[in-house]
Amino acid sequence: MTNMRKTHPLIKIINNTFIDLPTPSNISSWWNFGSLLGLCLVIQIITGLFLAMHYSSDTMMAFSSVTHICRDVNYGWLIRSLHANGASMFFICLFIHVGRGLYYGSYMMVETWNIGIILLFTVMATAFMGYVLPWGQMSFWGATVITNLLSAIPYIGTDLVQWIWGGFSVDKATLTRFFAFHFILPFIITALAGVHLLFLHESGSNNPSGLNSDSDKIPFHPYYTIKDIFGVLFLLLILLTLTLFYPDLLGDPDNFTPANPLNTPPHIKPEWYFLFAYAILRSIPNKLGGVVALVLSILILILMPLLHTAKQRSMMFRPISQCMFWLLTADLLTLTWIGGQPVEHPYIIIGQLASILYFTIILCLLPIAGLLENYMMNWK
């Protein structure tokens, strides 16, 4: 009798995705982050659902409802802390996942890569709207500053901002619609992740060598299920340590104060995972130029398949490209640091230089390094 796992229409899909999937035998721990992102998404949806049961999206009630969750709801403090720090873990995994794709040339699977970029934008939008919901000082002013950037769009900018706000300032209408979008977007992200997997399994996984691995494949289960479980335990250890010992480490102290439109905080800044993009935005004195640079800082990833000049797919055997990659990593960490600093000397010039370097590495230095390595190996 044929195994039900291989014949049943629904179970067959799960089987072909997580059990009998032919997988390269040499993929390293850097390939664990896809499954960890799936775990983060599940954690966020479950904790978010329980938070939504007790949250009120009214400007008069939002801050109090979050306080009520933390004080009066059974394990509400834990659910809220898991949700807030789960977002940080989500972005750590996202950045490593994208970095892995850049390092090992996974962007050559164009459809998978492009869906991944759409996913990145969607997750960033969801996180931004979620940050507004507690209705603290930084929530309110962060929402005001970031949504106001759309007014830089010629002709339609001002109307667009007022349309998003639902009035002439960030108010009740804004909070209500942000809550609605924040609730629905994770389910859209889940659907997009399914499409991401669909495209990935059309071509099969890449591997550290960047070579075709058809001759050396192993089943996903039990080898990579066990490996993924190890990654899951490690992620949960970090998340629970952060949640139970340092729950407010990555938050902003200003968000313990209820939103006050009459009092602007001295330094408006987003959550830590947006600081690199915020630093690029601030480094350009022109409003429209800053907004364009902000969008391009992520959108530039779409160009990666076009900018690939090397004859080898992976950077595993390309030392010059490796140097460029780690320079880019250091530059992004510098931008993250600068984004959290006040707008004054010497931070302004450091931010401008780091922003220029970011675009220079991606658009010029990485393609040049690829050509140089081709020449050094006589692959003209």
Swiss-Prot record:
Checking CDD domains in the record gives: cytochrome_b_C, Cytochrome_b_N
Which Gene Ontology MF annotations are present? metal ion binding; ubiquinol-cytochrome-c reductase activity
How does the entry describe its membrane topology? Multi-pass membrane protein
Which cofactors does this gene product need?
heme b
| Cofactor descriptive note | Binds 2 heme b groups non-covalently.
Q: List all membrane-crossing ranges.
A: 33-53, 77-98, 113-133, 178-198, 226-246, 288-308, 320-340, 347-367
Task: Provide the assembly information.
Answer: The cytochrome bc1 complex contains 11 subunits: 3 respiratory subunits (MT-CYB, CYC1 and UQCRFS1), 2 core proteins (UQCRC1 and UQCRC2) and 6 low-molecular weight proteins (UQCRH/QCR6, UQCRB/QCR7, UQCRQ/QCR8, UQCR10/QCR9, UQCR11/QCR10 and a cleavage product of UQCRFS1). This cytochrome bc1 complex then forms a dimer.
Q: What is the recorded function of this protein according to its Swiss-Prot or TrEMBL entry? A: Component of the ubiquinol-cytochrome c reductase complex (complex III or cytochrome b-c1 complex) that is part of the mitochondrial respiratory chain. The b-c1 complex mediates electron transfer from ubiquinol to cytochrome c. Contributes to the generation of a proton gradient across the mitochondrial membrane that is then used for ATP synthesis.
PANTHER family registered for this protein in UniProt: CYTOCHROME B (PTHR19271:SF16)
Q: What is this protein called?
A: Cytochrome b
Protein source organism: Echinosorex gymnura
Q: What is the lineage of its organism?
A: Eukaryota, Metazoa, Chordata, Craniata, Vertebrata
Gene (name only): MT-CYB
